[in-house]
Amino acid sequence: MQARAIQKNIHVSPRKAKLVCDLIRNKPVTNALSILENTNKKTAVFLKKLLHQAIANATNNHAMQADKLYVYHVVANQGSTLKRTSPRAKGSADLIRKRHTHLEIVLSDDVNERNKEIQAIKDRIKKRAANNKGY
């Protein structure tokens, strides 16, 4: 079973947000919370709030136990970009891109769920290869 939470249009660059996402990927929820507490990045604050929301979704909506949860999937995708200009010499201007991020966290309580998914993908690839042998 999976529970997820999404936060859109956070005023952080996706490149910087991915660094913090990599810290908590595939970790138990308690470890992920302690890592985010001790990470001195702006994104860590947003991810901590989002992780609490995902835990609440898992316990309230899906009746999962909070102590068995782990971070199954966490991603920072590019959101909208605000474009501003900065004046330069001789009447020209540079473009300033103020990037935004969409964060998504998926929690799972089944440790073998990822292995089952990988095995299903491998089976599909084998089946496809067996069908294409004659070509």
From Swiss-Prot:
Disulfide bonds: none
Keyword check for Ribonucleoprotein: yes
Quaternary structure (record): Part of the 50S ribosomal subunit.
Keyword terms: Ribonucleoprotein, Ribosomal protein, RNA-binding, rRNA-binding
Function: This protein binds specifically to 23S rRNA; its binding is stimulated by other ribosomal proteins, e.g. L4, L17, and L20. It is important during the early stages of 50S assembly. It makes multiple contacts with different domains of the 23S rRNA in the assembled 50S subunit and ribosome. The globular domain of the protein is located near the polypeptide exit tunnel on the outside of the subunit, while an extended beta-hairpin is found that lines the wall of the exit tunnel in the center of the 70S ribosome.
UniProt record, GO biological process: translation
Family: Belongs to the universal ribosomal protein uL22 family.
Cellular component GO terms, alphabetical: cytosolic large ribosomal subunit
Organism annotation: Malacoplasma penetrans (strain HF-2) (Mycoplasma penetrans)
Name of the protein in its database record: Large ribosomal subunit protein uL22
Gene Ontology molecular function: any one: rRNA binding
Pfam families: Ribosomal_L22 (PF00237)
NCBIfam families, sorted: rplV_bact
